[in-house]
């Protein structure tokens, strides 16, 4: 059975932000965006909440293993420990699917001595490898393949884009 797919517009993303932002209370000392999916939602949250201390993390998992749960993460980019220590840090990604990436980042940020909270646009509890945990804040629960407006190529085979005609 083919997986359900949702192609979102910028209006959809704005509506998700309208649901997500009121959940977060108090000031954050830092915002850590997970590349690539967390860059745009992270920027939107930082702007809306006036967070100016913005960091990025990039994590890669080996694709060579057949059991993806056994893949060991490689940090391609991560802030120095001193930039996180004793701070309230909001970690942002677009989606919590398997949870591998964001959970890996959570562990490393906590090891630096930070207080961590997480925010995603979409949470997929049915796909999560971490059944006892999930994001602190999320805008929607889904089981669909989500295609965000900034992902013009991913998952779009055969899907017409609104307002565009083929050349």
Q: Where are the regions a protein language model picked out?
A:
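PRPP-associated nucleotide enzymes
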Residues: 1-167
């Amino acid at each position: 059975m083919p997986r359900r797919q949702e192609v979102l517009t910028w209006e959809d993303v704005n509506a998700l932000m309208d649901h997500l932002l009121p959940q977060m209370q108090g000031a954050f000392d830092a915002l850590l965006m997970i590349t690539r999916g967390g860059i745009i939602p992270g920027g939107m949250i930082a702007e809306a909440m006036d967070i100016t201390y913005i960091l990025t993390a990039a994590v890669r998992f080996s694709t060579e293993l057949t059991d993806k749960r056994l893949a060991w993460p490689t940090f391609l980019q991560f802030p120095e420990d001193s930039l996180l220590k004793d701070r309230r840090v909001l970690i942002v990604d677009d989606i919590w699917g398997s949870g591998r990436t964001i959970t890996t980042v959570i562990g490393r940020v906590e090891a630096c001595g930070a207080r961590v909270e997480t925010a995603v646009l979409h949470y997929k509890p049915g796909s999560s490898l971490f059944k006892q945990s999930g994001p602190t804040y999320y805008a929607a629960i889904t089981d669909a393949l989500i295609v965000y407006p900034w992902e013009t190529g991913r998952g779009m085979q055969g899907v017409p884009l609104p307002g565009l005609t083929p050349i």
